[in-house]
Amino acid sequence: MDEASGWYDQGGGDVESLHNYFYPLRVRPRSRVVALSEYGGIAWPMPGHEPPRRAYGYGTAKSRAELTARWKKLQLETVLPQLKKGLSALVYTQVSDVEDEVNGLFTYDRTAIKPDPAAVRAVNQALEAAFEKTVE
């Protein structure tokens, strides 16, 4: 159970749930599962797939290449090192763009993936391999 989902954690439930968009991520081993339950949020309104309203994100990329580079850096330089320290779950913000946010991995109309799919696959495989080493 995740009692606080990123808010003021009072030590209840099975999960220590962290939301982190702007600060260095520092995970320490805990008695509960540590989950990064909100992170990412890199905005890029893909041309031709924008939502009907003006939208925002937690940082804006100017192109697919920049979005992919920033996403890769976040995964490999911020998330990956924390796996050895006990990070056990990830929830990226967010799966797809919505009416007022363009920080999804998929477009608002869900017809296109925004970062480069080959890069996403390679990084996800690296994260999975690193995680598997922590549970062996």
Over which residues does each language-model region extend?
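Substrate-binding/catalytic cleft of secreted carbohydrate-active enzymes
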Residues: 1-111
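Catalytic cores of secreted or luminal carbohydrate-active enzymes
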Residues: 107-136
